[in-house]
Amino acid sequence: MPQVGVIVGSASDHPVMEDTMKTLEGLGIEAELVTASAHRNPERVREWVNGAAERGVEVIIAAAGGAAALPGVVASYTTMPVIGVPLASSELGGVDALHSIVQMPPGVPVACVAVGAWGARNAALL
């Protein structure tokens, strides 16, 4: 059973998040990776998050670029820890995603790591 759930909004995010998956594997931590967009597949995101605890997931790592809604949407559906990984997917180099993730409103907590591959690796280490 996976202890960590990793969710990304697009298949194009997979290469960066391979650092997360490899780091978790190296630590002997089982993880699952799913692709579901907060903008294009919000219902799929909700269903995945709501079933996470039943699958054994204890923490969720959510990666997103641009408006980076995914980590906050995930956190709105669960009380388990959510770590947001901002990705550099726009002309702003990930600063937009970073600001979106660190500015969650009260009651929707998301921990935030560095932009890109360094953050992806650190999310696994947390």
Language-model regions, residue ranges each:
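Solvent-exposed alpha-helices and their adjacent loops that cap or buttress functional pockets
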Residues: 1, 52-54, 75-77, 101-106, ...
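Proline-centered loop/turn at the N-terminus of a beta-strand
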Residues: 3, 81-86, 108-109
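Short glycine/serine/threonine-rich phosphate/pyrophosphate-binding segments
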Residues: 13-18, 41-45, 64-73, 92-95, ...
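N-terminal beta-loop-helix "entrance" segment that forms/cooperates
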Residues: 32-55
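Short, glycine-/small-residue-rich phosphate/pyrophosphate-handling segment
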Residues: 90-126
